[in-house]
Amino acid sequence: MATTQTIAVLSQKGGTGKTTAVRTLADALRRAGVQTLAIDLDPQGNLSDYFDVPPDAEPTIADVLAGRASAAEAIHADLIPANLSLAETELMLGGKLGRELTLRRALAQAPSEYELILIDCPPSLGLLTVNALVAADHALITAEAQYFALQGVEQAMEVVGLARDSLNPELQLLGVLLNLADMRTVHSREALVSLRERFGERVFATVIRSSIAYAESAERAKSILDHRPDLGSDYLALAGEVLERLPGFKEARGRLARLG
């Protein structure tokens, strides 16, 4: 089997539907037969909630980073969950030598059957996000269709560049995703134009449409692919683009096309 590829999914701030993107992208990839591990690296634990993992589930990613558990021991139904204890662990890591390498070292022991790992980064560009970028092969940046979308992506790109230059020279930008956009509005269309003018083909062709259905599916811990298949088609298209930008997934792309 090819080497596992890791994607850090990040945004400059919260509210960009980043966690929904990780949840649904993981689901779409799994349905295409891609063995996918999701990691919740946000102390708020929203991804864990979305996957219906109990808040008291143990061990968590905090235990992995603190050296109390291995990555394999912390997997709950293809997810390594998080809770508020991760905030304490982040503070602890701040005084540790080689703190930026902690997650990469831990994931070196992850089960080899996983072909892809998706990391849901916290909505800040601090130590946990840096750990994710150092552990990752690719970065996927999400942006909401707002006035400051371009500025937020540029700030996230700066952190990606710093991680690449100082700690992870192999890190590549997988793409920029315009998330939760209403393309009927002028500001959504302008946000997409500005992103494409600035970042060109690195912006995914797929735009994720905004809908209250995403909040409903999260509340029910149910994938949007099942809750609203018409909206889920956006994520099937995005998964296809992601696989197209990664080496070694031609067969999975074919399976995904049949799902659509």
Language-model features: locations:
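P-loop NTP-binding core
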Residues: 1-260
